[in-house]
Regions:
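Active-site-adjacent structural elements that line small-molecule/cofactor binding pockets in enzymes
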Residues: 1-297
Length: 297
């Protein structure tokens, strides 16, 4: 099983900027990384009561007055700065954008980059952001996401796309160019919840949860149980058991941790490698590593 490694780009916060994006992406490519990733928020309300699923207290640490680059625009920029490395969204919040326009941007990016796009897809968690964007679909965001993913595939793969859904309808329209990747750019579903796993089993080419960030621990034992659930649901959806590839996203902290109190992904390089092998043994073939630091190499 081939193993790939990727890392997140500084597309938000105090490190965000054109030179930083270019520098980290090119350095990652030079070092042999396989993919780079950008995340997605469009407007950050200053008062947020929605529960953030990747913090123990449910409070996100985003700062509304700091830059947060639009991910598809950022990836177009990165495509022009690199030659080989794959370009991913981690994750694109699918309900936020017109689905036909989104499919067009992704298809164009795939063509112009030579087939390097990975669509990491999620439903979103911040109700206040939906409201700020004039969207009333927060409570239906899962159903909207499922429908839009089906529409993307229709547009990307059919010569005469036609789609009649609850949230979007289209017929008798041309849609070109088609993506370079066939049948379409891989769709990796983000999230660790039951609905996310069901979505990956039915619509995804990959599943990409974030782990080791309370309350989403996803240590090897917990992740193994969720993978078994994913495989079962994939077969029930009429697909091969191994149709959905496995990705694990985590922060890595290099320090001198040792002994029984050492946390996973904390420690010396050989300890980190041993931790990663535990996930590899579960069938994980792609790792997205968040390297911790405050300066750009």
């Amino acid at each position: 099983m081939a193993i790939t490694f990727g890392t997140s780009l500084p597309s938000r916060g105090e490190m965000a900027g054109p030179e930083q994006l270019r520098s980290v992406a090119q350095r990652a490519e030079d070092l042999g990384y396989d993919h780079v990733w950008v995340s997605d928020h469009i407007v950050l309300p200053k008062k947020v009561d929605s529960f953030y699923p990747y913090a123990a207290d449910g409070v996100a640490t985003f700062r509304p007055n700091e830059p947060y680059y639009e991910p598809l625009a950022a990836l177009n920029f990165i495509a022009g700065c690199t030659q080989r490395i794959r370009l991913g969204t981690h994750v694109l919040i699918i309900p936020y954008r017109n689905p036909v326009l989104t499919a067009k941007i992704l298809s164009t990016l795939d063509v112009l980059s030579g087939g390097r796009v990975i669509l990491g897809a999620g439903v979103g968690w911040m109700e206040e952001e939906f409201q700020a964007m004039g969207l009333d679909t927060y409570k239906e965001r899962g159903a909207v996401t499922d429908e839009y993913l089906q529409l993307y595939k229709e547009l990307w793969t059919k010569e005469n796309p036609s789609f009649q859904g609850k949230y979007y309808q289209i017929s008798d329209s041309g849609f070109e160019p088609k993506p370079v990747q066939k049948p379409h750019p891989p769709i990796w579903i983000g999230g660790h919840t039951g609905p996310a796993i069901r979505r990956a089993a039915k619509y995804g080419d990959g599943w990409m949860p974030i782990g080791l960030r309370p309350p989403a621990i996803l240590d090897p034992e917990e992740l193994g149980g969720k993978i078994a659930r994913l495989r079962k649901l994939t077969v029930e959806a009429g697909r091969p058991e191994d149709a959905v590839s496995l990705t694990f996203s985590t922060g890595v902290f290099f320090d001198d941790s040792s002994g029984s109190s050492r946390e996973m992904m904390h420690g010396r390089p050989e300890q980190i490698a041993a931790d990663l092998r535990q996930y590899q043994d579960l069938g994980v073939s792609n790792f997205i590593i968040g390297l911790q630091g405050s300066t750009v190499p």
